[in-house]
Amino acid sequence: MKRLFLASEFFVVADHIFENFIKEKRLKVLFITTSSELHKEECSWVVKDRAAFVRGGFEVKDFTITGKSKDEITEAFASVDIIHSVGGNTFYYLKQIQLTDSADLYRDAVTNKNK
């Protein structure tokens, strides 16, 4: 069963999610950092979210959709068990989704069409 977790600070609730909903370890996480790209320095929440996954025993792959083709994004989505988008500038992220024509990939990932 697919599950969608929405959290403004994932690192705060990560342990609860891992203990109660995600029992498997060593799952692959696509860690999408696109929303945080406009910040000049790496954001504390990005560091903390990534660390929470690593601490939980997950394999984390940093990824941005900026400048990627739809095929590259499709391949990245298909290669992981979990897709995590970090917080940041939502409008910038949406613009990148539009530029890459990848909105349907996100929809399909949530509605279970591709897995």
Residue ranges of model-derived segments:
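N-terminal beta1-alpha1 cap of cysteine-dependent amidohydrolase-like domains
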Residues: 1-86
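Short, contiguous, well-ordered secondary-structure segments
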Residues: 81-85, 92, 107
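Glycine/threonine-rich flexible loop motifs
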Residues: 90-100
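Active-site glycine-rich loop that binds ribose-phosphate moieties when present
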Residues: 99-107
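Catalytic nucleophile loop
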Residues: 84-87, 110-115
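Alpha-helical scaffold elements within enzyme catalytic domains, especially in hydrolases
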Residues: 52, 108-109
